[in-house]
């Protein structure tokens, strides 16, 4: 399968999940993350705002605020540029690029590139390759200097034995599903 076929396969699988399945499985994934040292020791959490039947990151956003973490969310500035901005609460979010919630204009741009970085993706494999939506926003953002711990949140159905990849594709350090917490060995 090529990347386009993998994207379609996973989107079809996610659309077969009921709202209740997404809520339950997302809860298990967030619970697995919040019990981990990578979450407990991170002051800063950079996370995507879920849409299109992704793992529900709004659960994580609420948990981060309860735990006193500094939370940053992405805002698409152009077809090739994305930046992260600090959120003080969920009311800082407004509808943005493709209808995805993003920080409003009152939010301050992140001045750091350090902490726990939650990566989105459609498909992952056990070699930590990742297929996103094809825009390259996260590969570009993460290619700049940073000291992030990169974690991908995914449903088990998004984890495949092998997926097509290119050498420049960035890999997460961890993949967390409702049943697995997988750490990449360097």
Segment roles from a protein language model:
Residues 1-112:
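N-terminal active-site beta-alpha-beta segment that forms phosphate/nucleotide-binding
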Residues 80-186:
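Conserved phosphate- and dinucleotide-binding cores of soluble alpha/beta proteins
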